[in-house]
């Protein structure tokens, strides 16, 4: 009986760890991600939206140029970008702008010196 209880507990933990991936979006949040925000803050503008449900069908409420606005969503691959512990001494150089610029399962991630394609972090 004890072994069955441990197996059941293990199965529940395994299934529970996958729930955020399936049910991780908030109500009203659209699939996809926000495009990168490289623009400097030029002036203070009020937010055009607070959440995705305030945007037309194919747009998401994203932070861009220092305020939230409805922008076309971009596809996002599974996994998260690894942390970068380095500091850049040269000007930033972007080798990608969005996940779809990268081959296979690689993600377009911020690095010390710009964005580049990297394998997702294991976690």
From Swiss-Prot:
Classification via InterPro entries: Elafin-like_sf, WAP_dom, WAP_four-disulfide_core
Keywords: Disulfide bond, Protease inhibitor, Repeat, Secreted, Serine protease inhibitor, Signal
Location of this chain's protein in the cell: Secreted
Signal peptide: 1-24
PROSITE patterns, sorted: WAP
Predominant localisation class: secreted
GO molecular function: serine-type endopeptidase inhibitor activity
GO cellular component: extracellular space
GO biological process: antibacterial humoral response; innate immune response
Disulfide-bond pairs as recorded: 34-62, 41-66, 49-61, 55-70, 81-109, 88-113, 96-108, 102-117
Biological function: Putative acid-stable proteinase inhibitor.
Protein name per its UniProtKB record: WAP four-disulfide core domain protein 5
Upper taxonomic lineage: Eukaryota, Metazoa, Chordata, Craniata, Vertebrata
Gene (name only): WFDC5
């Amino acid at each position: 009986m004890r072994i069955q209880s441990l197996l059941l507990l293990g199965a529940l933990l395994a299934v529970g760890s996958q729930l955020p991936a399936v049910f991780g979006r908030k109500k009203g949040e659209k699939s996809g991600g926000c495009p990168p925000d490289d623009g400097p803050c030029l002036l203070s503008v009020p937010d055009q939206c607070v959440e995705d449900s305030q945007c037309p069908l194919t747009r998401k409420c994203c932070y861009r140029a220092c305020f939230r606005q409805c922008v076309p969503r971009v596809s996002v691959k599974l996994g998260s970008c690894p942390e970068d512990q380095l500091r850049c001494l040269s000007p930033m150089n972007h080798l990608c702008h969005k996940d779809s610029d990268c081959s296979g399962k690689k993600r377009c991630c911020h690095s010390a010196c710009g964005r580049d394609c990297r394998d997702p972090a294991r976690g």
